[in-house]
């Protein structure tokens, strides 16, 4: 009997040990599960952090892609379009300022702006040679037209056209370009232009009347709007030989275009 009692006690103690071991094992599992939450954040907050992290990664990748696209786009934009000959119809009208032979079949149209530094350079260095070769020899009709980009351009162009004749126009045209650095960028440009006009024989009151002339202003705006429609017009100075725009304003390029136009006219006359 005593032996049976001892066996029962042994079995009871063994059973308790197994329960305690299982409890300890279970408690270990609970600790493992709870470890990610030891930073006092709820499961929802932890999940939100994961979402935010993933979002930042996606945005970062998109930014890299967009940067690459911008670089590719910029590299395409840096490629300047090639200027190809573009035919534009230009006819000499009564308001044009023409040098040379008005009846010539070769018409060279120059577009300039009074405040354009490149235009001033052209007229002081390249134009004299062109004038000697083609204008003084009456081979071409050379038309000078204004492209108005600023208020200074408008006021200066009006001064040059104030008298209305070609000689007065050329006189003021040359002075305005030669003195460009003195008046074009001054806050008192109107006063300086008035002084230039007075020295050239245009009193202040007469210049004021010209500034208020709708006819002169309309002519200048019409000239500007016409060339602005040319597909390859890229600014001043620009030149059109029988309606075809030249590559640039070098003496070689302009002479090449003029010589070709003269040769074409000669061939037409022979065939006729």
From Swiss-Prot:
According to its UniProt record, the EC number is 1.8.-.-
Q: What does this protein do?
A: May be required for disulfide bond formation in some proteins.
Give the transmembrane ranges. none
Keyword terms? Disulfide bond, Oxidoreductase, Periplasm, Redox-active center, Signal
Q: Where is the Thioredoxin domain?
A: 74-263
An annotated Gene Ontology molecular function = disulfide oxidoreductase activity
Q: Name it.
A: Putative protein-disulfide oxidoreductase RP025
Specify the signal sequence span: 1-21
Q: Name one GO cellular component term.
A: periplasmic space
Q: List the disulfide bonds.
A: 116-119
KW Signal (keyword) present: yes
The places in or outside the cell where this protein is found are:
Periplasm
Tell me its family. Belongs to the thioredoxin family. DsbA subfamily.
| A Pfam family that the UniProt record links to this protein | Thioredoxin_4
Main location (coarse class): periplasm
The answer to whether the entry has keyword Membrane is no
């Amino acid at each position: 009997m005593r032996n049976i009692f001892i066996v029962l006690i042994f079995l009871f103690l063994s059973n308790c040990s197994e329960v305690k071991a299982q409890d300890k094992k279970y408690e270990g599992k609970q600790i493992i599960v709870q470890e990610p939450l030891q930073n006092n954040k709820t499961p929802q907050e932890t999940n939100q952090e994961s979402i935010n992290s993933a979002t930042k990664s996606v945005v970062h990748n998109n930014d890299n892609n967009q940067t690459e696209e911008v670089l590719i786009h910029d590299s395409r934009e840096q490629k300047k379009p090639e200027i190809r000959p573009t035919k534009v119809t230009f006819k000499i009208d009564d308001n044009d300022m023409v040098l040379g032979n008005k009846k010539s079949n070769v018409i060279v149209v120059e577009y300039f702006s009074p405040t354009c530094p490149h235009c001033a350079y052209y007229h002081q260095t390249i134009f004299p040679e062109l004038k000697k070769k083609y204008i003084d020899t009456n081979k071409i009709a050379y038309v000078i037209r204004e492209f108005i980009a600023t208020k200074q351009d408008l006021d200066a162009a009006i001064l040059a056209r104030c008298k209305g004749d070609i000689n007065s126009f050329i006189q003021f045209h040359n002075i305005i370009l030669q003195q460009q650095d003195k008046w074009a960028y001054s806050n008192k440009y109107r006063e300086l232009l008035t002084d230039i006009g007075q020295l050239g024989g245009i009193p202040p009151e007469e210049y004021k009347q010209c500034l208020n002339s709708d006819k002169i202003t309309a002519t200048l705006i019409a000239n500007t709007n016409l060339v602005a429609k040319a597909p390859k017009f890229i600014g001043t100075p620009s030149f059109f030989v029988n309606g075809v725009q030249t590559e640039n304003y070098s003496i070689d390029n302009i002479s090449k275009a003029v010589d070709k136009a003269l040769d074409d006219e000669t061939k037409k006359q022979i065939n006729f």
